[in-house]
């Protein structure tokens, strides 16, 4: 398995970490197919580039074997860089791309996700985790290979720590989806079990990211992450159990064989409980580092006076107010006025630990306040409200 240099970007000629020529050729064929589909509906000068992100863009994509033939395992994630397109034109293009992505999924076997990036905004792009990782490792599969050169430098050592809080929110939300299946009494087997474990391991990898970022040791390459986590002398909570889970999560990313957990009689509820506790412990530690003080408890953490770092500057306050007004309405704003100037993501970050720590419990006043619902609302309703908001503001 290749060991990436800690400073240099990933090799530009690979999509996977250790796939053979047949694996690489399969992913390359998929890229050509997807590029052809995009360039049929979008042409220069409006089209600037199709940029492959994520694991395949960083030469760390996963693969599986089906009847002796390689196939991708992870989603294909792209930014499409466009120029000179107004809001209405971009909205229309997004609708077309949604249809195209479904067609492509049927051909390549994994989700194909597109997001638009305006060429005019590159020079002032946000200093975010997704942008920093994209700059470090990406593949331009169609268009100008230097399209991202206009973006400012985004060193990982200076990455705003609230970006990792956001990552923990997004991966913790997958744990909430798992918990809803358990609370509903669903039979978790077959493909459902594979998805269940896929979500568990995504959360485990996010915990690794947060633990590294809390010590300014974050790196996008998974092999480097694993080395830094294993070699750390930091007394992280639950470190021994975490490293065991992280090793399995790493294997599941590169060489997924999730069906083996069903064959071994794995108990989904027990696995979920372990992962939720590690997620809660990691979030409490990381947020204590970010805020410079310990987290007293999850009820106290949910207070709107404790900022979660989303919508980070004063200029964002009018936008935060507008988002809350649009989402919760004038009456909701009055009832939960302390949240009015916080980004809605702050509400979600505040609510999620309470939902995961107390599955099945009625909404406490703090949880209800964050989600804009009535105290005492059933857990199922509160979790559904959370996921509705998360899909809008993740």
Residue spans for each PLM region:
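Helical scaffold of the NTase/Pol beta-like nucleotidyltransferase catalytic core
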Residues: 2-58
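Conserved NTP/Mg2+-binding pocket subregion across the NTase superfamily
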Residues: 4-26, 95-215, 221-240, 254-328
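Active-site nucleotide-donor binding segment shared across nucleotidyl transfer reactions
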Residues: 35-76, 81-87
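Short, conserved charged micro-motifs
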Residues: 86-94
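Polybasic, proline/glycine-rich intrinsically disordered low-complexity segments
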Residues: 239-251
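Solvent-exposed interaction patches of small proteins and small membrane subunits
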Residues: 250-253, 375
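Non-catalytic terminal regions of proteins
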Residues: 285-394
């Amino acid at each position: 398995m290749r060991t990436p240099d800690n400073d240099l970007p990933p090799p530009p000629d690979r999509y996977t970490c250790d796939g053979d020529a047949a694996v690489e050729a399969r992913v390359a064929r998929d890229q050509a197919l997807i590029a052809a589909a995009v360039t049929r509906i979008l042409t220069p000068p409006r089209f600037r580039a199709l940029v492959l992100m994520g694991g395949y863009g960083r030469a760390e994509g996963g693969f599986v074997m089906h009847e002796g033939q390689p196939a991708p395992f992870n989603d294909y994630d792209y930014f499409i860089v466009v120029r000179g397109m107004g809001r209405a034109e971009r909205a229309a293009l997004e609708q077309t791309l949604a249809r195209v992505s479904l067609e492509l999924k049927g051909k390549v076997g994994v989700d194909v996700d597109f997001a638009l990036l305006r060429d005019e905004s590159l020079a002032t792009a946000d200093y975010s985790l997704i942008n920093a990782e994209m700059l470090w490792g990406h593949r331009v599969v169609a268009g100008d290979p230097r399209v991202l050169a206009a973006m400012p430098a985004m060193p990982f050592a200076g990455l705003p720590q609230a970006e990792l809080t956001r990552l923990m929110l997004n991966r913790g939300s997958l744990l909430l989806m798992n918990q809803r299946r358990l609370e509903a009494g669903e039979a978790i087997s077959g493909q459902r079990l594979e998805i269940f474990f896929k979500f568990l391991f995504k959360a485990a990898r996010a915990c690794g990211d947060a633990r590294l970022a809390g010590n300014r040791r974050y790196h996008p390459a998974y092999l480097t992450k694993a080395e830094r986590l294993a070699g750390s002398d930091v007394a992280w909570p639950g470190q021994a159990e975490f490293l065991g889970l992280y090793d399995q999560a790493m294997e599941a990313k590169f060489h997924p064989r999730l069906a083996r957990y069903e064959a071994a009689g794995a108990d989904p509820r027990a696995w979920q409980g372990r992962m939720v506790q590690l997620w809660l412990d990691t979030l409490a530690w990381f947020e204590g580092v970010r805020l410079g003080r310990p987290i007293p408890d999850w009820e106290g953490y949910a207070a709107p006076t404790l900022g979660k770092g989303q919508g980070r500057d004063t200029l964002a306050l009018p936008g935060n107010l507008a988002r809350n007004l649009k989402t919760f309405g004038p009456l909701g704003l009055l009832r939960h006025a302390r949240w009015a100037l916080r980004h809605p993501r702050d509400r979600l970050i505040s609510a999620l630990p309470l939902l995961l720590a107390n599955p099945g419990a009625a909404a406490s006043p703090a949880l209800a306040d964050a989600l804009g619902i009535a105290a005492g609302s059933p857990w199922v309703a509160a979790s559904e409200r959370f996921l509705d908001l998360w899909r809008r503001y993740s």
